[in-house]
C-alpha cells in the first residue's frame, strides 16, 4: 500500500519495468470506489511447479512454475474485501483481483477498472487503436508519445467499430525499451467480464485499464465471490522469449473437457476466397431486395449463377481436398438468408438449419465422407447473437446428424442486442457459451470477429481457432502492408492461435484488388503463425499452376 492506496511495481534484472502503479475499481450506482482506504489484513505466499500436457499446441508439455502471493485487503469504512493475487514467472507477471463473499460487498457494478501500468519512459510500441468492436487494424509502430498523433490515421473502415480515445490501444500490446527490454501487456482467462483495453496518459506514460461498456455504459455486473481476468506482463531481454512464453496459457484453468479424443488439428480448403475476392457470392438469388426466413420462396427464385456454395463446386473442392490429403472443406453461403445479411441490423438473419436449393447437405456430406474428407460448417450470425443462441442447439444437432465436427462462426456488423459491443461482458459470455455448448456436441469452434483470445484454449481446447485481427481477407479489400504479419506473433497470437487463412498464390483478385504478398511470403506464414487450424485459402486451379509450392503447404501446414 501507498498509504491506504493499493499499488504494485515490477523489476527485472535489477531494473524498474513498471513504476509504482495504482490498483482498484471505480464503482457505479452509489458504490464507494475501491481505490483507497484499504489496510492489509493478511498476506499468503506459495510456490507451484507442475508440468502439464496440452491437447494440441506447439509444445508436447508445458512447465507451469511460479511464485504466488495473495494480498488480502479490507476497505475500512465499508467493510468491503478485495484481494490481489500476483503470480511471478521467469518470463513475467500476472495479477488479478479476487473478491471473497465476505463483509458488505456482495453485488456491485463496475464503472471502470483502474489498474495502472506506469512505464519508465517513452518506449517503442506496436499497437492498434482501442476499439470496442474490432481488432481488424494494421499494426502501427511509434513511440508512446506518437500514439496520439498517429491514431486517427491508424483507424481504417470496418462494418462495426467504436474507437473510444485518442490514446487508447488494444492488447496484446508489444513494447520495447531503449535498453532492449521487451514488455508485452495483455490479459488471461477472460470469463464473465468485459475485454480490457489500455488508455495512455502521454504526459506520465502511464496506461490505465479501460473496459468495454455495455449498452447502458456500465463496464460489468459482479457478484461475489468472483475473480477478474489476469492482467499479464511478459518481460524479457530476448524477443524470442516473447514468442515462446506460455505465461498466458499457464494462467488459465486446466482443461475442463474430460474426453478430448475428438479434438484434433485440421488442415482445410474452402469455398470462401471466391466470395471474398469477388469471383462468386454467398447469396443464391438476385430476385429479392429483402428476404425473410419464413416467407421467401427460394424454390421458385431464379439462381443468380454466382452462388459459390453449389453442389458441383463443393464437390470440386472435396475432390481436391481428398486428392491432396486435406482433412476438410469449409463451405460458406450454404444456408438461406444471405441476400440481405449485413448492414440492416436484422435480428432474424439466419436459422443455421435451412440450405439453399442448390446445396444438398445430406448428399454432399456423404460424398465427402466417402472420400475421407469432412465438411466444416459455417455459422455467420451477422452479430445477432440472441438469434444464434435461439437456434444454437438445433444447429449443433444438425451438424452431428450430418457428420460435421467443426464450425466457423462469424460476428460481422453491429451487435444485436442493439447498443451492445463485441467485447462487452454480455458478448464475452456468449462467445464462451458457444464454445462450451459446442463441446457437449463434440464440435470444434473457429470464431471470427469474436474477442481476441486470452488462453482459454487450454481450458476449452475445442476452441481451435480465432480470427480477431486483420487477416488475409483484407488483401482482397485493398491490401495489407507486409510488416503486419511480422508483428502478429508478438501481439495477437500471444493469447492463442489465429485462423489467418494464408496460401494465396494468385495475387490479382477478381474485384480488382492486389494482394501485397508473394508466394514465398504466403508459404512463410504457415511457419511463423502457429495454428492447429490451417487453411489453404486459394482456388484449386491456382494451386495446380504451382504444384511445387503447393507441396510445401501439404508438407508443413
Language model segments and positions:
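N-terminal accessory beta-strand-rich subdomains and adjacent acidic, glycine-rich linkers
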Residues: 1-258
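Short conserved micro-motifs at the rims of enzyme active sites and ligand-binding pockets
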Residues: 128-130, 186, 195-198, 242-246, ...
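Short, hydrophobic/amphipathic alpha-helical patches that form generic packing surfaces
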Residues: 274, 488, 502, 522-531
Amino acid at each position: 500500500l501507498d498509504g491506504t492506496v493499493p499499488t504494485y511495481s515490477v523489476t527485472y534484472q535489477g531494473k524498474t519495468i513498471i513504476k509504482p502503479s495504482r490498483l482498484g475499481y471505480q464503482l457505479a450506482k452509489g458504490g464507494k470506489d475501491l481505490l483507497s482506504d484499504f489496510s492489509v489484513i493478511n498476506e499468503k505466499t506459495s510456490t507451484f511447479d507442475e508440468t502439464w500436457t496440452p491437447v494440441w499446441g506447439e509444445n508436447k508439455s508445458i512447465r507451469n512454475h511460479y511464485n504466488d502471493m495473495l494480498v488480502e485487503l479490507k476497505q475500512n469504512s465499508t467493510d468491503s474485501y478485495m484481494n490481489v493475487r500476483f503470480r511471478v514467472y521467469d518470463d513475467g507477471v500476472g495479477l488479478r483481483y479476487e473478491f471473497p463473499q465476505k463483509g458488505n460487498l456482495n453485488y456491485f457494478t463496475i464503472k471502470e477498472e483502474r489498474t495502472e501500468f506506469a512505464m519508465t519512459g517513452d518506449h517503442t510500441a506496436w499497437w492498434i487503436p482501442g476499439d470496442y468492436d474490432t481488432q481488424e487494424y494494421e499494426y502501427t509502430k511509434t513511440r508512446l508519445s506518437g500514439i496520439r498523433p498517429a491514431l486517427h490515421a491508424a483507424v481504417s473502415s470496418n462494418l462495426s467499430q467504436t474507437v473510444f480515445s485518442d490514446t487508447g490501444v488494444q492488447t496484446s500490446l508489444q513494447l520495447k525499451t531503449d535498453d532492449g527490454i521487451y514488455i508485452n501487456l495483455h490479459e488471461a482467462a477472460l470469463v464473465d467480464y468485459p475485454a480490457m483495453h489500455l488508455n495512455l496518459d502521454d504526459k506520465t506514460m502511464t496506461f490505465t485499464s479501460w473496459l468495454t461498456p455495455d449498452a447502458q455504459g456500465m463496464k460489468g455486473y459482479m457478484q461475489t465471490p468472483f475473480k477478474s481476468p489476469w492482467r499479464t506482463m511478459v518481460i524479457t531481454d530476448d524477443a524470442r522469449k516473447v514468442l515462446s512464453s506460455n505465461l498466458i496459457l499457464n494462467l488459465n484453468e486446466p482443461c475442463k473437457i474430460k474426453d478430448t479424443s475428438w479434438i484434433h488439428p485440421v488442415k482445410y480448403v474452402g469455398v470462401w476466397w471466391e466470395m471474398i475476392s469477388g469471383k462468386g457470392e454467398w447469396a443464391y438469388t438476385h430476385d429479392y431486395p429483402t428476404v425473410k426466413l419464413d416467407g421467401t420462396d427460394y424454390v421458385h427464385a431464379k439462381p443468380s449463377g454466382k452462388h459459390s456454395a453449389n453442389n458441383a463446386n463443393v464437390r470440386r473442392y472435396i475432390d481436391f481436398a481428398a486428392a491432396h490429403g486435406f482433412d476438410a472443406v469449409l463451405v460458406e453461403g450454404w444456408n438461406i438468408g444471405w441476400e440481405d445479411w449485413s448492414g440492416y441490423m436484422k435480428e432474424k438473419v439466419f436459422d443455421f438449419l435451412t440450405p439453399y436449393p442448390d446445396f444438398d447437405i445430406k448428399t454432399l456430406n456423404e460424398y465427402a465422407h466417402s472420400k475421407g474428407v469432412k465438411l466444416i460448417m459455417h455459422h455467420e450470425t451477422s452479430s445477432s447473437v440472441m438469434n444464434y443462441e435461439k437456434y444454437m442447439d438445433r444447429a449443433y444437432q444438425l451438424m452431428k446428424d450430418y457428420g460435421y465436427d467443426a464450425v466457423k462462426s462469424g460476428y460481422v456488423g453491429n451487435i444485436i442486442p442493439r447498443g451492445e459491443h463485441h467485447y462487452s461482458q454480455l458478448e464475452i459470455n456468449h462467445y464462451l457459451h458457444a464454445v462450451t455448448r459446442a463441446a457437449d456436441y463434440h464440435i470444434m469452434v473457429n470464431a471470427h470477429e469474436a474477442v481476441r483470445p486470452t488462453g482459454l484454449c487450454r481450458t476449452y481446447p475445442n476452441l481451435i481457432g480465432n480470427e480477431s485481427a486483420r487477416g488475409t481477407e483484407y488483401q482482397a479489400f485493398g491490401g495489407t502492408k507486409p510488416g503486419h504479419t511480422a508483428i502478429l506473433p508478438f501481439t495477437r497470437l500471444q493469447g492463442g492461435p489465429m485462423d489467418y487463412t494464408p496460401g494465396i498464390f494468385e495475387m490479382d483478385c477478381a474485384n480488382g484488388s492486389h494482394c501485397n504478398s508473394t508466394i514465398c511470403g504466403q508459404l512463410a506464414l504457415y511457419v511463423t503463425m502457429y495454428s492447429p487450424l490451417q487453411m489453404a485459402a486459394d482456388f484449386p486451379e491456382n494451386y495446380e499452376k504451382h504444384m511445387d509450392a503447393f507441396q510445401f503447404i501439404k508438407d508443413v501446414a
